[in-house]
Amino acid sequence: MTSAHNAPAPKQVDAKHVGALMAALMAAIFAFQLNASMLSPVLTTMRVELNITDAEIGLTQTVFFTACAVFSLFLPRLGDLKGRKKVLIGMLACTAIGCVISACATNVTMLMIGRVIQGVAGPVVPMTLLMLHAEVTDNARYARLMAILTSVNGGIAGVDALLGGWLAGNFGFRSVFWVMCGVAVLAVVLVWSFARESTADETPKMDWLGAILLSAAFLAAYLAINEIEKLAGANWWLIAIEIVVAAVLFVIFWHVENAQKNPMVTTTYLKERRTWGLLLTTLLTMTGVFAVMNGIVPALAQDTSVGASMSADTVSLATLTPYALVGLVFGPVAGVIASKMGYRSTLRGGLIVSAIAMVFGVFVCQSPHIWGLVVLSVVLGLSYAGTANIMLNGLGIVLSPEDNPGYLPGLNAGAFNLGAGLSYAILYGVQQGFSDAHGATMGYTGAMIAGIILLVLAFLSSLLIPKPAQNAAEEH
């Protein structure tokens, strides 16, 4: 990586071009985000109209997010070699095709095929951040613009889900997929018109063997985590087999990469703190927070025996909407802070505030009230969705070496996905264990305490992340 002392001067980029580029990249992120979040209130309508079971409709979501995770591992690297604009347009085109297939689905198999193809859009965020970084080399300016793009990734302040519910209620679930398709096509046009092509400094042939082995190892680990999430209903023999398969495939991947002339990821980079330090921090952060806001808090809010006894609609408005809205609004502010204090310092601040918020959450679990849940959601929206999540994405870009800028954002996306799955497995497991032994209130409390411990570990792990050499603003 270029050091901060001998880095070339940032190139001057026309403000109008950057504005047009931001609009195009934002459209691409919208196209992906709608596929991820717009269907949440539509699942029941889809189940009824297709006459399928809850388990089958849940599986269509699982295959989408699994596809997102797998494609995220290698498409950013393919963009390094073949051209990021070209690959991004291909991803968006595949997403549009997947939306058409899903909109025309007459059975669950056809719907699953469509959702898998939509999952090609999984690495849109790291791809757009790499494209932005190729154009905007001034670190302070990049930090601010990066935060604007990334802040959208948590959902468009709940408006996307509300729109999805309205469309499904008035026009059926197929209308939702047609809207997604339209946004994806618009994104293709904007990226084609306003983005410039960029590649890595070196563009050897793609290491497809390494990509396949890494993807297979990740898929085995991901499937094991999905099975663990079933808790008492999990098949532990299957989990053990999948974990062994994942480990064996990763060992083979390691040896293959050592032997390759132009590997997908050199093992030298994998051994460095910029790789494993960041990936460990991302994994621990996601594991500590994700299921809290997307599972534990909504469940506590709706619990009629020991919770706040809120309706499902009220829960969304009181917890998930303010969480997403604050994250969306505060993200650009976090970018400004990062441009002055550095990514690592801003990340650590976000982790500390998140842990403090969850300490408050322990008291909320003991005496649940709507306003306590609102405060918890707002603070976590600010500290995690609007700060820590954005800084982790940003570090994946600025810590990457110039000869292979796509590998770390891809692996980091994998860590985000694994962390999300582990969060449900670990925090729900703790909740169930404490609940069985000490009652429901202690179940919620135990899950919150487990989240705090994981965030403390994430903070300690963040101390191992090295200073981004290309970030002259980083002081600590």
Tell me what each language-model feature is.
Residues 18-32, 39-41, 54, 264-469:
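12-transmembrane solute porter fold
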